[in-house]
């Protein structure tokens, strides 16, 4: 039977009324913005400013970068199971924010960014995003409850995608007022700010609620 969309919406709003579910959505919305900024600005910066050949950029990001991203995804799942979803979620995305901020510092600090920094950043940053994203998936599944749990999980994915898109839309205003190095540093601080929400994202209360409702 096809469920009434209004009932699904009601269940979804009820599910997000739980503090851990709401704060997790808020955390995701703010924390993924720099991923959108990075994905939009990095190819242009590497080819136009650092002088990389577009083919070389694609080979590095699609070769070693993609391989480390794959390993990061596996590692993120293992670490989330062992050390906790929230901790690894923030470790992954937070490490990316710090790494991108340090990259911004190097852009400002060097007349020509050393090649090893250019190469290292391009290869390593996708792994940190992957670690955090897998842990985020795990957290989203734990937080998704009520009869609209599938829709709720999809909502978390949509919030993450929306955050990335917002980041790409910010490129115009940001580049108008800030240099590339300053943008990376600004995004680091902006995306680390939601760290105070982590303590409110404990899924245990919702996990217990799901267990009780299934009994």
Question: How would you name each of these model-derived features?
Answer:
Residues 17-38:
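Pair of pore-lining "gating" transmembrane helices in MFS-fold secondary transporters
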Residues 40-58:
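Short amphipathic helix-loop junctions that connect adjacent transmembrane helices
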Residues 146-176:
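A late C-terminal transmembrane helix in Major Facilitator Superfamily
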Residues 71-88, 175-176:
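Helix-to-loop junctions at the C-terminal end of transmembrane segments
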Residues 130-145:
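Intracellular juxtamembrane helix-capping segments at the cytosolic ends
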Residues 185-215:
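Multi-pass alpha-helical transporter architecture, strongest
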Residues 94-112:
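C-terminal ends and interior cores of transmembrane alpha-helices
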Residues 1-23:
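Juxtamembrane intracellular "pre-TM" segments in multi-pass secondary transporters
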